[in-house]
Amino acid sequence: DILLGLMKRLIKHRASDLKVLITSATLDGLKVSNFFSGCPVLNIPGTIFPVEKFYSTDRPTNYIESSLRTAIDIHVKEAPGDVLIFMTGKDDIDKMVSKLEERIQNLEEGSCMDALVLPLHGSLPPEQQVRVFSPAPPNCRRFIVATNVAETSLTVDGVVFVVDCGYVKQRQYNPSTGMYSLDVVEISRVQADQRAGRAGRTRPGKCYRLYPSSIYQKEFL
């Protein structure tokens, strides 16, 4: 926001030789255009397949456990396809990966296909991050447990199901203490849409939102 404000000020002084190109997968193009005195907007649509969305009746008290149950239900009941599970950070991802691997091992043998659980976050070494781009072995479903890095930064082929806990970890400034902290906060509506869209990149998919539709409509900004 600060950068856009500075660019608008610079344009007034250097309109003849300063050209600004803003690209984004999430910004509201009309708002940005109005802010920059009605500048043109170019839309480059991608191929998006339909995504069916399912909402929880209420907010779960423990989003990790709720995500875990949803992932297991998908594995047992749904057709083949990889699952992308959004968590807030490395600690949540580590817990989710451990619990999911344990729960899958305890499933009745032959009741479902094999499974491969992969974490994805910025702290992973590059050689571990690129594992998510390798296709799943035959008769195997991949579970990719990721931070918001998987919202817009990359597309993972094979993802058909998305589990969205509705939270993200963000850097917040506390004016009373003058310090920053990493806090778990609700995602925005744009982020929710981006997460759901991950399920429709290569074929029709499903998104399981662990919050009611009323929260998406009224509370997400």
Task: Enumerate the language-model features and the residues they cover.
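P-loop NTPase motor module signature
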Residues: D1-L221
